[in-house]
Amino acid sequence: MRAAIVFVCLLLGAGCDESSPVGPTVGLNERFTLAPAEVAVIRDAGLRVEFVDVSSDSRCPAGVLCIQAGDAVVRIRVIEGNASTFYDLHTGDSNRAAIVHGSVRIALAELQPYPFSTGTIAPGEYRATFTASRV
């Protein structure tokens, strides 16, 4: 019996990256929000999506008059089986706010918090909201 329990534990943990906290399990067409390094499981698609980080954030701060709205770049990692692919999603360009991985479209819906001119955003404070849908 003990061997069976150990086997099940190993089987369940085999597909997990121990360095990334597991986040929500969501279905297609559901919005989900992740913190940096958090991973969502997309059931019905066989994918996991990790919010890696915000590699740059030049969005115009709230309360400031800017010529351009700016852009933030959200790096994600899509994990399918043992393979993973990195992508950059942009807040300031609707043509680059989504990617297609196989038959699944992953779109960045929102990045919070929005910058203010009076402070900086610590990397761990970011929360990115995504959707995943069939192409």
Question: Where on the chain are the PLM-derived regions?
Answer:
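Positively charged n-region of N-terminal signal peptides that target proteins for export
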Residues: 1-4
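Hydrophobic helical h-region of N-terminal Sec-dependent signal peptides
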Residues: 6-10
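Surface-exposed, beta-sheet-biased, low-hydrophobicity segments with strongly acidic/polar composition
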Residues: 17-135
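C-terminal motif of bacterial Sec signal peptides marking the signal peptidase cleavage site
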Residues: 12-15
